[in-house]
Regions:
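TPR/TPR-like (Sel1-like) alpha-helical repeat modules
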Residues: 368-374
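Structural detector for internal amphipathic alpha-helices that build alpha-solenoid repeat scaffolds
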Residues: 6-25, 42-57, 65, 73-87, ...
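Helical anchoring/docking segments at protein termini
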Residues: 1-5
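An edge-strand/N-cap motif at the start of beta-rich repeat modules
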Residues: 29-37
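Core helices of alpha-solenoid repeat scaffolds
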Residues: 29-30, 60, 90, 120, ...
C-alpha cells in the first residue's frame, strides 16, 4: 500500500461527495507536506517537520529521510517528531541505524530513546540479528537508554566478530554501570583491537568499586597485557582502590602482593607508605623490589619512615630502605647527614655509603668529619664517599 493510501485510510468515514471532498483536501495536505519535506527550502522543511507529528504513521518514511538532512535542525526535528509518533516508527528507525554516518545515527538513537519502552525489545532483537551497523547502533541505543534489562545481551555483544559491536558493547556497559559486566570486561582487556581494550578499561574505571577486587585478581593474569591494563585501571580508579590494594599486600599469592605494591606506588597515596615498608620484608624478592620502587615513587613523605627502617630494621629491610633512599636521591641527603653521628657504627657506615652514591655536595663537610671516626670501616666508607663526590664534581 502506498503511503498516500495509508494516509487517506486514516481519514475515511462515511461516504458520498462530502467524504470525497474531505479526502481530496487531506490528500492535497499530505502532498504539500511531503513536497515540503523532500523538496522545500530549509524553512519549508522545518515547518513541515513540526507539523506532521499528529498525522502519524504515513509520514514515518519521509521523516526517516529527514534524519539524513544536511541541516542539524531538520535532523533533530525529524527525530523529535518520530519520537512523538512512537511504536510504529521503531522498526524503520532500527533499519535506519544501518547508516554509517554518525550524525544520522545519533538522531536515530535519539528518536528511539524518546519512544522508550516500545523500542527496547526490538533493539535487543537487533543486537543479535542485524547488519553490523544496526547491531552497533542497537547496542549503543540500549546503553544510552540505560536499559539494565539488556545487560546480558550487551555482554554477549563483547564476543561477536565485529570489533565495532564489541566497542559499543563496552561503552554501553559503562553507561549502565552494572557490576555483572566486570568479569567480561576484564576479558576485554585482552581484545585484539586497541579501541575495544581502551573502552573496556574506561568502563571498568567508571564502574569503580565493584570492579576493584576483580581487577586486583587480574594482576596475576597469564597475559601480561591484561595485568598491565588491570593495573592502569586501578590507578585510574585511584583513591577507592587504596584500601583493597593495601589488604592485597597480605595475599597468599606473591603475584598479587607484587602487583598491589606496584599499583600503590603509582597511585601515590601516602596511606600506603607504612604497609609498603612492611613489604620490604616480604619473602619474595620480586615483591621487595617493587616495594623499593613504590617507596621511591611516593617521594619525600616516605623518607622519615625509611630512615627509621634504615636505623632499626633487620638486614633485609635495611637493604630495601637503602635502595629506596638511593633512588630518592638528593631529598634524602639531609636525613642521612643527620645519622652520620649515630651511636651505631654500622648506621654511620651505611649513611656514608649512601651519601657517596647520591653525590650531593652538601654532604662533603660532614663526611670529612667522619675521616677521624673511631671505627676504621666508617673512616674507609667516608673516604670512598668523598672520592665519589669529587669525581662527580670534576666530571
Amino acid at each position: 500500500m502506498s503511503i498516500i493510501k495509508k494516509f487517506l485510510n486514516l481519514f475515511k468515514s462515511g461516504s458520498g461527495e462530502e467524504e470525497e471532498a474531505r479526502l481530496r483536501a487531506q490528500k492535497e495536505r499530505y502532498e504539500s507536506f511531503l513536497k515540503a519535506l523532500t523538496e522545500g527550502d530549509l524553512d519549508a522543511r522545518w515547518a513541515a517537520v513540526r507539523s506532521v507529528g499528529d498525522l502519524g504513521e504515513p509520514f514515518i518514511e519521509p521523516l526517516i529521510q529527514g534524519l539524513k538532512d544536511e541541516y542539524w535542525i531538520i535532523r533533530r526535528g525529524s527525530a523529535d517528531t518520530l519520537g512523538k509518533i512512537g511504536a510504529p516508527a521503531v522498526a524503520p528507525l532500527i533499519n535506519a541505524l544501518d547508516n554509517p554516518g554518525e550524525e544520522v545515527r545519533q538522531e536515530t538513537i535519539r528518536a528511539l530513546q524518546l519512544i522508550g519502552e516500545p523500542s527496547v525489545a526490538p533493539l535487543v532483537h537487533a543486537t543479535k540479528n542485524g547488519h553490523p551497523f544496526i547491531r552497533r547502533g542497537a547496542v549503543q541505543a540500549l546503553g544510552i537508554m540505560g536499559e539494565e534489562r539488556a545487560v546480558a545481551t550487551i555482554i554477549e555483544s563483547l564476543k561477536v566478530a565485529d570489533a565495532g559491536v564489541r566497542h559499543e558493547g563496552a561503552v554501553a556497559l559503562g553507561r549502565i554501570g552494572d557490576p555483572r559486566a566486570v568479569a567480561p570486561l576484564i576479558e576485554g582487556l585482552n581484545d585484539p583491537k586497541e579501541q575495544v581494550r581502551l573502552s573496556a578499561m574506561a568502563t571498568l574505571c567508571s564502574i569503580g568499586e565493584p570492579a576493584i577486587d576483580p581487577l586486583i585478581r587480574a594482576l596475576i593474569d597469564t597475559n601480561e597485557d591484561v595485568c598491565r591494563r588491570a593495573g592502569l585501571s586501578l590507578v585510574t580508579i585511584g583513591e577507592s582502590s587504596v584500601e583493597p590494594l593495601i589488604r592485597a599486600l597480605g595475599d597468599q599469592n606473591p603475584g598479587i602482593r607484587r602487583g598491589a605494591t606496584e599499583v600503590l606506588g603509582q597511585i601515590g597515596n601516602t596511606r600506603a607508605i607504612t604497609p609498603i615498608i612492611g613489604a620490604l620484608d616480604d619473602q619474595e624478592r620480586l615483591v621487595r623490589i617493587e616495594a623499593v620502587k613504590a617507596l621511591a615513587a611516593l617521594g619525600v613523605p616516605a623518607i622519615a619512615p625509611l630512615m627509621q627502617v634504615f636505623r632499626e630494621g633487620d638486614t633485609r629491610m635495611r637493604t630495601g630502605a637503602m635502595e629506596a633512599l638511593w633512588m630518592l636521591g638528593q631529598p634524602a641527603t639531609t636525613p642521612l647527614i643527620m645519622v652520620l653521628k649515630d651511636d651505631q657504627s654500622d648506621v654511620r657506615k651505611r649513611a656514608a655509603l649512601l651519601l657517596g652514591e647520591i653525590g650531593d655536595q652538601k654532604a662533603v663537610d660532614h663526611l670529612t668529619g667522619l675521616l677521624s671516626d673511631e671505627n676504621v670501616a666508617v673512616r674507609r666508607e667516608a673516604f670512598e664517599a668523598l672520592e665519589m663526590i669529587k669525581k662527580r664534581t670534576t666530571a
